[in-house]
Every structure is written in C-alpha cells, then in structure tokens.
Amino acid sequence: MKTRIIQDEPEPEPEAAAPAGADTPVADERETWLRRAFFATAIVGYFVIGVVHPADIEVGDETALYIGIHLVQPVFILLLAWGIWLLVKDLPGRAAQVARIAIVPYAIVYSMFDAIAGVSLGGIVRQANEASAADAATVQRLMDSGTDYVGIVIFVASGLTWFAMAFAAALAVRRIGGLGPTLLMAIGAAIFAVGHPFPPGPIGIALFGLGIAWLELRREAAKAPEAQPVLAP
C-alpha cells in the first residue's frame, strides 16, 4: 500500500519593512542646502551692509539708506540664527549646547535692540531734517550732549549675544571640521562683535563666512565614498 505524502507549500516570506530612517538622507540633504543658503544670504548681505553703512548719522544727513539698512537687518539676523541652529542642532558637547541656547537671546537682542534702535534713530534725524533750523539744531545738541548710555547698552548686548552664539558654534564644529574652520569662525565672530559697520563688520563676517565654507567643504569631502580599486583584466 502506497502512502501519498502531501506537503504544504511554503508560505512566502513577508517583505522586509523599509527602515524607519529611509527618508533621513533626503532630509539631511535638504537641511544641508537650507543651511548653506541661509549662511550665504546672511553673510553676503551683512558684508554689503557693512560696506555701505554710514559710520554715524547726524541731523542734515540723508536717512533713507540708514533706515533701509536697519529694516533689512532683521532678515539677516534670523537667517544667521537659523543657519547656526541647523549647524549645531545634532552636535554633541557643551559648546553645541551653549550655541543652541544662545540663539534665542541673539535673535531677540540683535533684532530688537540694534535694528529697531537704528530705525528709531534714523526716524528722529528725518524728523529733525524736516523741522526748522532752530529745532534741528536742538535735536543735534541733544544727540551730542552727555553719554549715550542706551547706545552703549545696545552695543554691548548685541555684540555679546552674537559672540556667545557664534563662538560656541565655532568650538562645537571643531570635531567635524578641524582646527582651521574653527579658528576662522572664532576670529571672525570676535571681530564682527565689535560692530557691523566698516571696517570690523565686513572683515569679521567675511572671516566667519570663510570658516563656514571651509567647514562645508570638509564635511562634503568626508561624505564622498572612497575610490574602489579597479582589477586589471
């Protein structure tokens, strides 16, 4: 008597699920180009602002350029803040943590104190230019008299918040970019903290931008695959 053995067909193996981080390379690439675009726009913009920025403004001076500079400035401030965030948000270490924390004070202080104060001063000078000669002279005497404590506070607060953020970011990227980019960024940050008009402004932001560019080149080179040896036939 023959026995017929029936074998069940093996069930097809379930398809492997896509890894949770499958979209991560695309997201990383998008963030990379956003970071570069933010830095490029802000650095070039601040360089131009520094070159054309009047050293001082007095009654009788043209105010359109001065006011326009300080109206545009908050855009570059926020782009720098966003660029720094994208640069250090995933980096470990105390310096990266300090840079992340310092972003908000920098954005608030530099925007509200420096940019808004510049617009306000330009508006005062414009009103004085439209007033009588006697009133204009009175405004100028008020601007020249005494110590500008408000201006000193704005200058110090703006410079310190920028330097804290940018210098901490420069230290944080040393482990991925090396000493060269860190030095350029740190020196540029220190010079730019003195002020954004010429000469410290353009020089400082240019050095900081060169450090960022050097860092990006090193990061790009680190991502490039190693060349595979070709076997001779």
Specify the residue positions occupied by each region the protein language model found.
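A short, highly charged, low-complexity intrinsically disordered segment
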Residues: 8-17, 221-233
